[in-house]
């Protein structure tokens, strides 16, 4: 019947679906998943006919406006297209399981991190905002005057505690796997030639064997990929590392910072 490709397709109302794409059959996409959720990162399972895994998380919406309120915990599900059966591979209300990918030998890799519930306004936070409002207003005024001074004199009003100038990207935050990661403090505290970890230690790269046993490959992982020969490549924000196997020692292959996506080409 020709080659089959798995795709993740976005919908108008903010959800996304896993679809089946056949290039030799007209190019249409047949949706394989449903529900008010974000479905992404589909991957065929090696050695099994028409079986794939994917990442999914439910969408919480406002009961009147239908606007997004947040996302539920991300899990990894397995689908057998021959039988129509679905099975949870990695699912826990306290964790996100992200970016599933298979090695050639059938080992499943994914990222695991603690789940952070979406924001719900609290009375205590509202009262705290009222108390801190004068201080925040003063800080905003000082920041405005500092920018004004830089524009006309080239010199800041504040010099104490100014971070050293560094080359390369210097964002305040990055949006990574559905969550904003603030890097202002890490950048400020880091020395000129080094950078603190950009993601928490509990962001783990996990390997799951066919028998269900799991092994933590690395911590502080923000992105990864598995090569055709089974080599593991991952980034922790300070560089890109390679491991020939789960038990091997990682080797730094690039000093590029803030690598948010890795892919093997060719």
Model segments located where?
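Beta-strand-rich domains and repeat architectures in extracellular enzymes and scaffolds
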Residues: 1, 181-201, 217-226, 260
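Multi-bladed beta-propeller domains
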Residues: 1, 20-43, 68-98, 129-141, ...
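Residue-level detector of Asp-centered blade-edge/turn motifs that repeat once per structural unit
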Residues: 2, 46-48, 103-105, 227-228, ...
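Residue position within the beta-strands of beta-propeller blades
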Residues: 5-10, 51-56, 107-113, 232-235
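Residue-level signal for WD-repeat beta-propeller blades
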Residues: 12, 36, 45-46, 70, ...
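A short loop-to-beta-strand structural motif that recurs across blades of beta-propeller domains
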Residues: 17-19, 75-77, 199, 204-206, ...
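Short, conserved, GDST-rich strand-edge loop motifs in beta-rich repeat architectures
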Residues: 54-71, 113-200
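Repeat-solenoid scaffold signature
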Residues: 86-102, 106-121
């Amino acid at each position: 019947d020709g080659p089959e490709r798995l795709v993740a397709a976005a919908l108008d109302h903010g959800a996304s679906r896993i679809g089946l794409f056949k290039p030799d059959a007209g190019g249409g996409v047949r949706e394989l998943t449903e529900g008010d959720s974000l479905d992404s990162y589909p991957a065929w399972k090696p050695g099994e006919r028409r079986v794939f895994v994917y990442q999914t998380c439910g969408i919480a919406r406002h009961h009147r406006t239908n606007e997004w309120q947040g996302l539920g915990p991300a899990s990894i599900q397995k689908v057998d297209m021959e039988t129509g059966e679905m099975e949870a591979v990695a699912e826990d209300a306290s964790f996100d399981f992200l970016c599933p990918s298979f090695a050639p030998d059938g080992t499943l890799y994914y990222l695991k991190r603690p789940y952070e519930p979406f924001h719900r306004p609290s009375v205590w936070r509202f009262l705290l905002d009222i108390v801190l409002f004068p201080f925040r207003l003063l800080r905003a005024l000082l920041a405005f005057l500092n920018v004004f001074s830089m524009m006309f004199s080239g010199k800041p009003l504040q010099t104490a505690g100014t971070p050293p100038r560094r080359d390369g990207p210097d964002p305040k935050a990055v949006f990574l796997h559905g969550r904003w990661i603030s890097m202002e403090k890490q950048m400020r505290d880091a020395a000129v030639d080094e950078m603190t970890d950009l993601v928490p230690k509990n962001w783990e790269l996990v390997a799951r064997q066919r028998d269900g046993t799991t092994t933590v490959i690395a911590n502080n992982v923000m992105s990864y990929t598995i090569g055709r020969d089974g080599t593991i490549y991952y980034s922790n924000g300070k560089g890109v590392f390679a491991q020939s196997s789960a038990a091997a020692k990682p080797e730094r292959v690039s000093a590029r910072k803030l690598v948010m996506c890795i892919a093997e080409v060719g």
